Amino acid sequence: MITPNNHVAEMQGLYGPFTLAERVVQKIWLRGDFDRTRLALVDGRPLEIRHAGVWNLLGGPDFRGAQLVIGGERIIGDVEVHFHVTDWRAHRHEMDRAYDNVALHVVLFPPSLGERPARRGDDREIPTLVLLPLLHRDLEETASDDALETITARDEWEKFADLAAVPAAELAGLLRQKAAGRWRQKGCFAQLRIKRVGWGMAAHCTALEILGYRHNRAAMLAVAAKYPLEAWGVGCDVASIYAESGAIWQTQGVRPANHPQARLRQYQAWVVARPDWPDRLLQLVKTLPTGGLEATPTKLARQAFGLAKLRETFARDIAGDAVGGTRLDNLVCDGFLPLITAQTGEDAGMIWFHWFLGDVPEQVRTALPKLGVAGRGSGQALCHGWGQGMLAWILEQATRASRSTGENLPGA
């Protein structure tokens, strides 16, 4: 159940501890942000999810009325989500009649050897599904994205008050430092994905994920897993992929231009034009300027490195002119450059920092000029690095604020 005191775990990440709320695990289940093609329960029985259930914001199980097929048997029941199997007993759910219809216990971490599964009040054993080995993305990346989505949804200038108090001479250095950490993190996440699925599949998954925007990232990853790059050539039926992928699409609040079916058609046009685009991306690295985040003014860096022309090259030679504008900028900075760096070891951090801002929360776009960091009246151009530095700072503040409520758990 979701409560104001939502359970929070603290885990060890790439560069230190991070917090993960149980609510995030519930979102993973709701959005299907895991490999649904190889679902198996702890007892070995296969699982098929027909419907994840309705997210319950009141008392009782986390999801009501899920439609499942367990070992060939169709079941309609509730789903409860926890970090550990033992949380069921710790929360005394077996004593609560509201949980008598729970048909599946979804946990993040695998149970210890010999650990007993959860049981309902009628003493019936509840099947258990472990999510961790099935996740599309690293836990730290998922927690970070969720925190930023939640924080930046608040239209409050007050959250930047501490930054506004930093002397102007120090503020730029602080945000550069935060941006550098964010760049290293993105490179590590890209490296993990390449190690897990290989270069071509990693590039394919990353491209579709970014085209999904924040509403349909998980659904796009599910599509990428089911339909590899080779399936997107001439004759690919986008309508069938959209309907039959098994992905959980979110269309409420999505602009028509960003509708997932429109983005799938966009990716098809991309692959038809450049079926070998992951290989082209690796070849392009030979011509890229490399280096760290030296304090070069963005305007000069863009001129020296020819970033405007490089933007055209990415659009034409890699994406086949199928993607442009700010979404192309996010493809370059969230996808292409981290992947290139992870695969080749050539640091594209300088390009990444000075690249065009791309899609960022509107609060970040307006805060940078207000703080005198970049934009109108600051003498510095808005760029991706400043935006990422700001996002990293926001996330760090939120992590510090929530850590006091976290419980110490082993790293994932």
Predicted regions and their residues:
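Intrinsically disordered, low-structural-confidence terminal and linker regions
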Residues: 1-9
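Short Lys/Arg-enriched alpha/beta "domain-start" segment
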Residues: 8-48
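Active-site ExK catalytic segment of metal-dependent nucleases
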Residues: 76-84, 105-107
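Internal, well-ordered alpha/beta segment that forms a basic, Gly-enriched binding/recognition surface
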Residues: 106-229
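Hydrophobic, aromatic-lined core segments that form the binding pocket/scaffold
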Residues: 175-411
